[in-house]
């Protein structure tokens, strides 16, 4: 392979990671370079401390300037249900019940329950108890939105276009009033 072809790939790998955190497979896909080539450049950048990596369920690559909490946030949002819960609660002006989240996100009750549990453990959401149900809301919207801007800039930029109009989940709670 010519040096001319290697250079763009090498620079692209670094640029993508410094721009925002990413997973290894997403990086390979976005750079459109061979897996082995990306791996080679990653090892060079990690050795130089130009980038960092965190291995877990996914191999996350990120800028050394990002705080650990932002990386945890990114990892958490790799789960589509957790991401959906967080986005719906960020957008909502009201605290929502689990039933409302199930109706809005169209995921199963156990999936929503698991996502809520993880978000509660991280203290990114808080639970409000009302007999016979609980509602959930974001603990610190400003802080979470700042982390969203660092990890998912496209979502943060287009956040105002995200609409919660459908379905109207409030009908599920009318029986308790």
Predicted features and spans:
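Short amphipathic alpha-helical interaction segments
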Residues: 33-44, 106-121
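Residue-level recognition of short, well-ordered coil/turn positions
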Residues: 21, 50, 93-94, 124
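Long, low-complexity, charged/polar intrinsically disordered regions in eukaryotic proteins
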Residues: 1, 25, 29-71
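Long, low-complexity, charge-rich intrinsically disordered regions
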Residues: 1-16, 62-66, 73-88, 92, ...
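A generic structural signal for beta-strand entry/edge sites
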Residues: 21, 57-59, 133-135
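Short acidic, hydrophobic short linear motifs in intrinsically disordered regions
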Residues: 19-31, 94-105
């Amino acid at each position: 392979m010519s040096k001319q072809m290697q250079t763009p790939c090498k620079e692209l790998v670094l640029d993508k990671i410094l721009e925002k955190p990413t997973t290894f497979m997403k990086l390979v896909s976005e750079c459109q370079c061979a897996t082995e080539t990306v791996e080679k450049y990653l090892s060079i950048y990690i050795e130089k401390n130009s980038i960092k990596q965190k291995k877990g369920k996914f191999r996350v690559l990120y800028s050394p300037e990002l705080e650990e909490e932002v990386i945890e946030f990114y990892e958490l949002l790799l789960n589509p249900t957790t991401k959906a819960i967080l986005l719906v609660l960020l957008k909502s002006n009201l605290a929502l019940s689990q039933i409302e989240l199930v109706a809005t996100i169209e995921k199963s009750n156990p999936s929503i329950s698991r996502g809520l549990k993880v978000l509660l453990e991280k203290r990114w959401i808080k639970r409000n108890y009302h007999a016979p149900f609980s509602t959930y809301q974001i603990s610190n919207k400003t802080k979470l939105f700042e982390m969203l801007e660092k990890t998912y800039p496209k979502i943060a930029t287009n956040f105002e276009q995200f609409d919660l109009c459908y379905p109207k989940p409030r009908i599920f709670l009318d029986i308790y009033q």
